[in-house]
């Protein structure tokens, strides 16, 4: 629990330009941490086999229909783009007047319901588009409260996803202070700066998630063995460093070269975001084909890899037991 005095010290006045969105958060935020800001516990713990668990992460799940489609396709984690608006948090990638999907509260209710019905949904990755937004009570505290009231009691863990450019903001500093055993923090970017950010902020290795990718990784894939900026190289360096609890790549679509998909998996990524490049998730033959590609590699390597289940804890170094 973080003290109110310490929390207020994070929230110094100053205008915050919201990245990737025309929305501007007001200066001088005033966030209050609820008194019942606790860590729900509804997680099972059962050792699996020694094969490494792999997360198949549905991309841009912005509607309740997208939740149902992704879980029906076999996704075991969901990536939800999150944008704050004056009237609430929404599943929204672009932050435009016509781009919002469902309210986050409704999305979380749907995910929790599916999890309680037996769906394999290990965690929700919150891709935070304007994490420092703060208006009408819509701020990072209210978002985390939704996670802890709706997702976590159902057994769904949470990944708070930031970009390297957002790590100096109020939201990042708040989240890192109050992470519970069901939550982790992710930074997307290049390996070396991300590793330095995590070290500087004193975040435990098992709570660190490094991600690297491109809307089409083929455009800057690299050789996987070079020291350049290619996506595959960044992922390989992240895994070999042992500086992160998990390493995820993105975005695999029906247009991604099959050999590139396989190479990302061969360097040891713990999961891949898959789906459409520029649209929200829904049932479509292209998405189903992408899943077949990823699962094809898993089938060929079943002695060493398997799809993660709800019993696998992504925020544990062993990945097989709850914290």
UniProtKB/Swiss-Prot annotation:
- Write the signal peptide boundaries: 1-20
Cross-referenced InterPro entries: PLC-like_Pdiesterase_TIM-brl
Documented EC number(s) = 3.1.4.41
Q: What are the alphabetically sorted keywords of the record?
A: Hydrolase, Lipid degradation, Lipid metabolism, Magnesium, Metal-binding, Secreted, Signal, Virulence
Cite the cofactor comment.
Binds 1 Mg(2+) ion per subunit.
Cellular component aspect of the GO annotation: extracellular region
Task: Name the family the entry cites.
Answer: Belongs to the sphingomyelinase D/phospholipase D family.
Descriptive protein name:
Sphingomyelinase D
**What organism, scientifically named, is this protein from?**
Trichophyton rubrum (strain ATCC MYA-4607 / CBS 118892)
